[in-house]
A protein has these predicted regions:
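N-terminal secretory signal peptides that target proteins for export/translocation
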Residues: 1-12
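Compositionally biased, low-complexity intrinsically disordered regions
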Residues: 5-6, 19, 145
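Bacterial N-terminal signal peptides
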Residues: 17-25
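Exposed, flexible binding/inhibitory loops of compact, secreted disulfide-stabilized domains
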Residues: 28-156
């Protein structure tokens, strides 16, 4: 009977230790899932921009339609252009982040066939980010692979 009680106590201790270790690992691991929700073109003109979008109205003014759930997430929109020939698209090489900065390495790829003449447009990529990682004042910068600045903003 004593043996069974000892095993039971050891099992409880092992279970609690495993649970505690699991929680420590989960708390220490702050992986954030950023989803690319949409990519395309918009006829809303302007230059290169990186914008933080917190509501449907602002997203609509950019000419972007996407099912963003603003109650639990926010959008980050990279706009590049304008262009007057069809076929441009954005290529995002990497996204890196720390507590003070988010760095996006991206560029636009020109069409292989030089494209067709078109009304001016800009390309965009929309990322969805959970609200739990929103930190006012964090710098968001977009650079080319050769480290030339494209656009910068701060989380308001």
């Amino acid at each position: 009977m004593r043996r069974a009680a000892k095993r039971s106590a050891v099992m409880r201790w092992s279970t609690l230790a495993g649970l505690a270790l699991g929680l420590i690992v989960l708390v220490g691991c702050r992986e954030v899932r950023v989803r690319t929700l949409a990519a395309g073109t918009t006829t809303v003109l302007g230059g290169n921009q990186i914008l933080i979008v917190r509501d449907e109205v602002t997203l609509g003014k950019l000419g972007v339609r996407a099912p963003v759930h603003f109650k639990g997430e926010f959008g980050v929109v990279l706009l590049m252009g304008p262009h007057d020939r069809t076929g441009y698209k954005q290529i995002v090489e990497s996204i890196g982040a720390n507590t003070q900065r988010v760095r996006v390495v991206a560029f636009e790829q020109a069409p292989a066939d030089a494209g067709e003449p078109s009304p001016q447009y800009r390309t965009y990529t929309l990322w969805i980010v959970p609200n739990r990682v929103y930190r006012r004042g964090v710098r968001v910068e977009v650079v080319t692979p050769s480290d030339e600045p494209i656009a910068t903003t701060y989380l308001p």
